[in-house]
Amino acid sequence: VISYWVLSGAKRRQIQQLRCCVLPAKMLKRRDVYLKLTRHNGRAGAHGTYNPKHNDRSFNLANSEHIDPERAKGNIYWDCFHGFRSALDPQDPDDLAATFSDVERQFYETHYTAFIESQNERNAKIRHTERNRSIPDLLSSRKTCPEETIYQLGTLDEHASAEDLLNLVTEFIEEFKAKFGEHVHVLDWALHLAESTPHIH
């Protein structure tokens, strides 16, 4: 978990211009109130690779006690093929990538199919077809599946507004893409408003 500190109560312009950086707790002024921006990364848990169904809410919300279905209508979703969408502005149901699982599968098929096919041909030539892999294999492997990051600004008792969190994280993602370029791809993310604090997966 990586923590950043953001001055609470800063004007919107200051928050939008803020560059996220690690700030040791001993440098914080006592009189200032800061919010902690927490970033948690991972690919898999005790039950295997993370399931993107939680992130785009493509499951029955009535089965989850910690999710308020009314507040879930305000969630904001983004993916690399369609951009922004929300429950209030649903996308075309005939779309090829309607869920984050579909988006991730489609991205992997577009970018990695040629590599997998050539690798599998090579494996066949050296008589090691047991090494062959497919797109579902890549998506379910702890080494090659998409990595999930969770951002939260503040705590249960005191947290930033969803708008401020959205502004900070979208700026952070742009900085991240500028720094790492084509080596790292942001496939999809979701701003969740229906749980105890606003956070982004």
Report each predicted region and the residues it spans:
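N-terminal nicking endonuclease/strand-transfer module with a His-rich metal-binding environment
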Residues: I2-H201
